[in-house]
Amino acid sequence: MDLVKYLTFSMILFLLGIWGIFLNRKNILIMLMSIELMLLAVNLNFLVFSVYLDDMMGQLFALFVLTVAAAESAIGLAILVITFRIRGTIAVEFINCMKG
């Protein structure tokens, strides 16, 4: 297993996620997808180091991060659908007008 290739790929995925957030700050759906891409890059790091060091903790952390990411996606998409139904748009500049 070539560790440098996997870590480089993971770094590229993480940087693409950061770039997606900074490039498109108007659409919250793309921001959520970019955050998911960043979490997948972190998971890849956990899995690569888990295999490289022959330790199961990295795989357990990756499973935990996937669980949290799934919950975060479900809540984020639910808020997104409700916001679209109420406001008619998913632009980020109107999100701060939420009542709570």
UniProtKB/Swiss-Prot annotation:
Catalysed conversion reaction: a ubiquinone + NADH + 5 H(+)(in) = a ubiquinol + NAD(+) + 4 H(+)(out)
Gene Ontology molecular functions: NADH dehydrogenase (ubiquinone) activity
Transmembrane segments: 3-23, 28-48, 62-82
Its membrane topology: Multi-pass membrane protein
InterPro entries membership: NADH_UbQ_OxRdtase_chain4L/K, NUOK/Mnh_C1-like
Gene Ontology, cellular component aspect: mitochondrial membrane
Keyword Transmembrane: yes
Keyword entries, A-Z: Electron transport, Membrane, Mitochondrion, NAD, Respiratory chain, Translocase, Transmembrane, Transmembrane helix, Transport, Ubiquinone
Cellular location(s): Mitochondrion membrane
Gene3D superfamilies linked: 1.10.287.3510
Enzyme class: translocase
EC number of this enzyme: 7.1.1.2
Signal sequence bounds: none
Record Pfam families: Oxidored_q2
GO biological process: ATP synthesis coupled electron transport
PANTHER family xref list: NADH DEHYDROGENASE SUBUNIT 4L-RELATED, NADH-UBIQUINONE OXIDOREDUCTASE SUBUNIT ND4L
Record-stated family: Belongs to the complex I subunit 4L family.
Task of the protein: Core subunit of the mitochondrial membrane respiratory chain NADH dehydrogenase (Complex I) that is believed to belong to the minimal assembly required for catalysis. Complex I functions in the transfer of electrons from NADH to the respiratory chain. The immediate electron acceptor for the enzyme is believed to be ubiquinone.
Subunit description: Complex I is composed of about 45 different subunits.
Protein's recorded name: NADH-ubiquinone oxidoreductase chain 4L
Species of origin: Marchantia polymorpha (Common liverwort)
Lineage: Eukaryota, Viridiplantae, Streptophyta, Embryophyta, Marchantiophyta
